[in-house]
Amino acid sequence: MLTPFNNFFQQRQNYHSSVIDHFENPRNVGSYDKSANDVGTGLVGAPACGDVMKLQIKVENDIIKDAKFRTFGCGSAIASSSLATEWIKGKSISDSLKITNKDIAKKLSLPPVKLHCSMLAEDAIKAAISDYQKKNGL
């Protein structure tokens, strides 16, 4: 039976090594208590392909101290989530908001057909920050 997971490995020659690395060794997988005041949660999805991405941030003094994600989707979606959490850790909220899907896509060398994965990651970052700011009246 062909599953998305197996399909990724059968087509791995079509992916850049950075996508394969983040897919096989995802960074920052996990979650936080979404009700905590220092946690922001972004949940985004792409109905066309079924990818769903949850990205959470833990903030202290306007700095994202930690980030976690859980993604149901293709290898490119998982890699985009993993990279996004790496990039925002240690950054200020304002600097994290400057990360774009183009930055993520370029770093991972995503093909045009997978650009929606990097868009989900950008949207998840923004949604998590927005959630944190709303919780804290910012």
UniProtKB/Swiss-Prot annotation:
InterPro entries: ISCU, NIF_FeS_clus_asmbl_NifU_N. Its main location: cytoplasm. It is found in: Cytoplasm. GO terms for molecular function: 2 iron, 2 sulfur cluster binding; iron ion binding. SUPFAM superfamilies: SufE/NifU. GO terms for cellular component: cytoplasm. Scaffold protein for the de novo synthesis of iron-sulfur (Fe-S) clusters within mitosomes, which is required for maturation of both [2Fe-2S] and [4Fe-4S] proteins. First, a [2Fe-2S] cluster is transiently assembled on the scaffold protein ISU1. In a second step, the cluster is released from ISU1, transferred to a glutaredoxin, followed by the formation of [2Fe-2S] proteins, the synthesis of [4Fe-4S] clusters and their target-specific insertion into the recipient apoproteins. Belongs to the NifU family. Component of the core Fe-S cluster (ISC) assembly machinery. This is Iron sulfur cluster assembly protein 1. It comes from Trachipleistophora hominis (Microsporidian parasite).
